Design a protein with these regions (language model features):
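Glycine-rich phosphate-binding loops that contact phosphosugars or nucleotide phosphates
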Residues: 1-80, 100, 167-172, 179-191
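Structural motif
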Residues: 12-14, 32-34, 106-108, 132-135, ...
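Active-site phosphate/pyrophosphate-binding segments
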Residues: 40, 58-160, 244-245
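Catalytic-loop motifs flanking and including active-site residues across diverse enzymes
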Residues: 45-52, 122, 177, 208, ...
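Short helix-capping/linker segments at secondary-structure and domain boundaries
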Residues: 56-66, 130-131, 217-230
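C-terminal active-site/capping subdomain that shapes the small-molecule cofactor and substrate pocket
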Residues: 148-232
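Short, small/acidic-rich helices and loops at N termini and domain boundaries
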Residues: 227-245
């Protein structure tokens, strides 16, 4: 396992987990353990995994987050929760509207810099909640290859929606690349939409986009008429792998 490999290489190790085998291994080896209680799907544990990792790197002096950044992030998320909740009508709920636009379409999510990990989150949430196809692309890398594939098959392009996660904190060159890539996809006949981060700090902006993507994925699942909670395909895969020792 990665835990054992890290110990063999002499790394300092700390376990963050809900218990189980990892906790037992860490305690047997005398390594520190942070245990948190979570019983839902792994994808819903991101506040724990992110918050605990952030606390760890800050305590180690590897990062610094101002209290004002945290408070702004909490405020932005509370506002987003009200705006995007199921109680909010379609006319004033952008997550519901975007989900409707993605119905029966292939989805590709673009982002640059630190927001690339948020694009990955959008992709995996659409996969797991809506049981729908989605991919993500990071810039500038995708400008070296993806744009060359905007010719065929035309029937696929017509049923593709390209989403661009944007931030006022994007590097100027990345912002230029995002705009140019949006235009290229539009000219190719795909659906194009941009989602802009809210807040002033990078932390608030990242979490605002993550929150928005989670709501979009949830509403897309409802539009498809599927239960967003189970991931039967992954359960079957794990079972088949576990059967082979």
């Amino acid at each position: 396992s990665s835990f054992d490999a890290a110990l063999e290489r002499g790394c300092q190790v700390m376990a963050l987990c809900t218990g189980g085998e990892l906790r037992q291994r860490a305690e047997r080896k005398g390594q520190p353990v942070w245990v948190f209680q979570h019983t839902g799907q792994p994808r819903t544990a991101i506040p724990y995994s992110f918050g605990m990792l952030l606390a760890l790197v800050c305590r180690l002096g590897l990062a610094r987050v101002e209290e004002s950044e945290l408070q702004e992030t909490f405020s932005v998320l509370r506002e987003g929760r009200e705006q995007l909740s199921a109680a909010a009508e379609l006319s004033v709920n952008p997550a519901k509207r975007l989900a409707g636009q993605l119905l029966n379409r292939n989805v590709v999510i673009f982002a640059a810099g630190e927001l690339e990990v948020i694009a990955r989150r959008w992709k995996t949430q659409i996969n797991e909640l809506a049981k729908a196809w989605a991919v993500f692309e990071g810039l500038p890398e995708s400008n070296h290859n993806t744009l060359a594939g905007l010719e065929f098959p035309e029937s696929l392009l017509e049923r593709t929606s390209a989403l661009f996660l944007r931030s006022g904190l994007d590097h100027p060159r990345n912002a230029l690349r995002l705009t140019a890539t949006q235009q290229a996809f539009m000219m190719a006949g795909t659906g194009v939409d941009a989602v802009h981060a809210r807040g002033q700090s990078r932390l608030a902006q990242m979490w605002s986009l993550l929150q928005f993507g989670d709501y979009v994925s949830y509403y897309l699942a409802l539009d498809y008429g599927v239960d967003p909670t189970p991931v039967d395909a992954l359960t079957r895969l794990k079972a088949s792998l576990a059967a082979v020792k």
